[in-house]
């Protein structure tokens, strides 16, 4: 049983090295100061091994709680603090966690459960909907992912990362773990790109590494990359869904002119989460790809005839592949069910040098602002109102097809309330469209492909 503090190297770094800051910080929290915070939480949480629900904020204290709970030997489920109260209650009822961190309060339930010795962290498969289905990750999974990211992005101890992505989101967590692995500082923030104070704050903390999902890069394109006042910025990374080619090129050209690097990446929470990274120098010739597999992983295309360029399901092999899923407390006792092999559910092909191009998704999972959304789960929530809705993703919005109704305004208001009560996506992510009938297949099933 190995805890995250040991694997990420926090215990071995120079004591006075700057490591973390957040929105309330006046100065960097050093390795030694963080170590003291972690040890305090470890001692407070000492006792039988338990499941911890951590509605984790992007703060130094939130990270100290995570590492402290891990040091005490507990398993931590990282959850969205903005989840509606009912969604939180449903998760607690299902899993009965022994410890809950929520809004700076700590509740000790005192409920131990059977946890596999290798299990370290749980991440939701659809964080914005509070899905009860978790990805089970070992400390070794997270360590392998962090090591590979450090290597492929060449992260060094002087590179300050912007920790604006939520820590319950696998991409946000990987920014933190990879930089801790390299001994590199991270400035954590709860602010977003559209907050007027965000950019001056990034300049103040001398941000060199800016990660983002398609929403962030589209926003920067509209705002104007050249208006960014970040003198230290050298690395930009993009994951969390497909970015349109125009925005890819603008981002690449902007950072290239500064002597920096732009990396397109691909991953899944089930891979802790990184699978591929496109090198900056390969962008011009291979901008449509997401790059080759990580140094410690490999990709095969199932259903293809073996020739480069032949489409099939993307299968990833690597030490960062999850242990498996959990849908109830009993599953938390299970060991590794994957054997380092992940069937991604995505369709794609490899070129002669092993670079992957993604051409589609085989499952009904979407991504809005980088957050994974189970479209079937959203659809079920609306259909519980007694009206039939069909949901598909269109770019950065969810489009709800519905049949004519005598009082459409009232129906939309009921639908929006149901969505806001259950999920954390903003109302701007929801659009409605009236149709006379739903397109269906010959088996009378909804034809989602045609609607898309």
Language-model segments: residues:
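Gly/Ser/Thr-rich phosphate-binding loop
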Residues: 207-212, 221-285, 298
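Conserved ATP-binding/catalytic segment of the ANL
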Residues: 313-376
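Conserved C-terminal "lid"/linker of ANL adenylate-forming enzymes
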Residues: 366, 396-399, 417-452
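Conserved pre-ATP/AMP-binding loop-to-beta segment of ANL
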Residues: 2-4, 8-18, 108-124, 131, ...
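Conserved AMP-binding/adenylate-forming core of the ANL superfamily
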Residues: 15-46, 88-89, 140
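Conserved AMP-binding/adenylate-forming
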Residues: 40-82, 164, 372
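Conserved AMP-binding A3 loop
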Residues: 27-32, 119-147
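Conserved AMP-binding/adenylation subdomain of ANL enzymes
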Residues: 143-160, 170-209
């Amino acid at each position: 049983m190995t805890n995250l503090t040991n694997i990420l190297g926090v215990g071995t770094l120079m004591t006075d090295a700057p490591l973390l800051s957040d929105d309330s910080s006046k100065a960097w929290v050093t390795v030694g100061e963080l170590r003291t915070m972690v040890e305090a939480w470890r001692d407070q949480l000492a006792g039988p091994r338990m499941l911890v629900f951590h509605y984790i904020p992007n703060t130094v204290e939130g990270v100290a709680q995570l590492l402290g709970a891990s040091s005490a030997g507990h398993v931590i489920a990282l959850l969205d603090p903005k989840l509606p109260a009912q969604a939180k209650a449903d998760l607690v009822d299902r899993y009965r966690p022994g410890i809950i961190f929520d809004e700076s309060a700590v509740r000790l339930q005192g409920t131990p459960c059977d946890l596999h010795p290798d299990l370290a962290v749980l991440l939701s498969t659809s964080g914005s909907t509070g899905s009860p289905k978790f990805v089970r990750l070992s400390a070794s999974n997270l360590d392998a992912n962090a090591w590979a990211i450090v290597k492929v992005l060449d992260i060094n101890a002087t590179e300050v990362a912007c920790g604006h992505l939520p820590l319950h989101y696998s991409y946000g967590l990987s920014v933190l773990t990879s930089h801790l692995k390299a001994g590199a500082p991270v400035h954590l923030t709860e602010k977003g790109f559209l907050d007027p104070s965000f950019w001056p704050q990034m300049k103040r903390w001398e941000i060199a590494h800016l990660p983002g999902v398609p929403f962030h890069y589209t926003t920067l394109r509209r705002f104007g990359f050249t208006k960014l006042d970040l003198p230290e910025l050298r690395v930009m990374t993009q994951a969390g869904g497909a970015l349109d080619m125009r925005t890819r090129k603008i981002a690449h050209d902007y950072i290239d002119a500064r002597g920096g690097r732009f990396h397109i990446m691909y991953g899944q929470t089930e891979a802790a989460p990184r699978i591929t990274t496109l090198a900056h120098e390969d962008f011009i010739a291979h901008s449509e790809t997401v790059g080759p597999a990580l140094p410690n992983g490999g990709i095969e295309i199932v259903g293809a005839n073996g020739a480069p360029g032949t489409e099939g399901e993307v299968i990833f092999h690597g030490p960062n592949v999850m242990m498996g899923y959990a849908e109830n407390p009993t599953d938390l006792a299970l060991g590794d069910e994957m054997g380092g092999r992940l069937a991604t559910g995505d369709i794609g092909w490899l070129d002669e040098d092993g670079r992957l191009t993604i051409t589609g998704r085989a499952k009904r999972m979407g991504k809005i602002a980088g957050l994974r959304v189970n479209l079937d789960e959203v659809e079920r929530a609306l259909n519980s109102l007694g009206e039939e809705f069909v949901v598909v993703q269109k770019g950065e919005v969810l489009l709800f097809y519905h049949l004519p109704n005598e009082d459409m305004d009232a129906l939309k208001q009921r639908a929006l309330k149901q969505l806001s009560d259950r999920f954390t996506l903003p109302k701007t992510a929801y659009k409605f469209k009236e149709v006379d009938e739903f397109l269906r297949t010959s088996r009378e099933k909804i034809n989602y492909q045609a609607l898309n």
